[in-house]
Amino acid sequence: MKIHAFRLTKGMDLKKSIEQYVVDKKINSGVILSAVGCLYQVCLRTADGVTVKTINEDHEIVSATGTLSMDGCHIHVSLSDVNLQTIGGHLKDNCLVNVTAEIVLAEFDNYEFSREFDESTGYKELVIKEIENNVRD
């Protein structure tokens, strides 16, 4: 396992930046270990899988979790507003960093993650391949 850490600055898109980092570093399989910071614009998909909400108010990143691959990332976040009310959902593009966001990722050397369309869900779902002796195809 390899650990990656990087910092985002004001105006950067949280999701796009994580996805670009994964591609740039050729991370075939990984997870988010930690994400802290503040957003001034939030864009989340709700649990119904359809509704997307955009909120133009400051929110602290309370937690983030997700699977990472060069084939796509699946990330959920919990966010707290100025009244300490917490919301959460599926991270979409246009979650914009206010001041900073500190991201720590773990990369696995014994797995390869990819995504394939699943007709039963309507989404590109995670496909997990275990790599024996750290030898990739």
Regions found by a protein language model. Name each.
Residues 1-74, 79-137:
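N-terminal intrinsically disordered, cationic/polar leader segments
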